[in-house]
């Protein structure tokens, strides 16, 4: 089985820059007013039981600012996703809400929704899901360059792993590919869902070409059915947490038993 090698640093960097958010011509004040407008619309839709529309408006509001949404908006966002049948969005937002508000009223009901969403996601994981990890350290005086690409895929109960690492992905120092046991793969997905690195929100990080020292990048993309969550980081605590999660996935890819 041939390992796919579609990923380069340029792609990873472009993905990160694109995810930083689109540049807007309007002032921050105008962006704040637009965000508030979406929050008002989302709340009205939520109160009227139009959960799909509420979900869209909450997502639009979140994209308009680096600042996190108010906790109550996050709670409603998660419930709207739960009611509209989007388990990954429900799981992420409601988990974030309970993390921020551990003593919140109605915690038990929120936890029931989280647990239900998690069960659905693990069921989806075996049928249609992907985990993609890209990590890179650019060559510098302080460190040699290295790339790692990991791709785990499950479809209709069949799971596969493709992984490689080296200075160049076109000529990797190490690579592995094969079919793996479904239960092991779903167990990995469960660990990812429990990881704060997947659930945490933090301000976007922009690549600075003048930054001293070795430049690092890590991208994690988790796809479960029609939903996905992408996390990426370049420095600081967000990078450390996400890099640790990427290392967990790499260790899994190195050690998991493949079919002969």
Task: Show the residue positions of the predicted features.
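Bacterial N-terminal signal peptides
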Residues: 9-18
């Amino acid at each position: 089985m041939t390992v796919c090698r579609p990923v380069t640093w340029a792609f990873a960097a472009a993905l990160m820059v694109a995810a930083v958010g689109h540049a807007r011509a309007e002032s921050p004040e105008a962006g704040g007013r637009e965000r508030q407008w979406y929050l008002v619309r989302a709340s009205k839709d939520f109160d009227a039981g139009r959960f799909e529309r509420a979900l869209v408006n909450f997502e639009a509001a979140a994209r308009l600012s680096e600042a996190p949404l108010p906790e109550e908006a996050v709670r409603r966002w998660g419930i709207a996703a739960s009611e509209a049948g989007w388990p990954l969005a429900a799981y992420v937002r409601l988990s974030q809400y309970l993390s921020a508000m551990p003593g919140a009223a109605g915690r038990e009901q929120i936890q029931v929704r989280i647990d239900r969403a998690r069960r659905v996601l693990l069921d989806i994981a075996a049928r249609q899901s992907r985990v993609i990890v890209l990590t890179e350290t650019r060559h510098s005086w302080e460190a040699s360059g290295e790339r790692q690409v990991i791709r785990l895929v499950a479809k209709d109960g069949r799971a596969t792993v493709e992984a490689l690492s080296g200075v160049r992905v076109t000529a990797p120092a190490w690579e592995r590919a094969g079919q793996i046991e479904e239960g092991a793969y779903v167990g990995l997905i469960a660990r990812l869902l429990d990881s704060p690195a997947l659930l945490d929100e933090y301000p976007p990080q922009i690549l600075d070409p003048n930054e001293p020292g070795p430049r690092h990048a890590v991208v994690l993309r988790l796809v479960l059915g029609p939903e996905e969550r992408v996390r990426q980081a370049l420095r600081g605590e967000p990078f450390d947490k996400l890099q640790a999660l990427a290392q967990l996935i790499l260790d899994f890819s190195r050690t998991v038993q493949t079919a002969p």
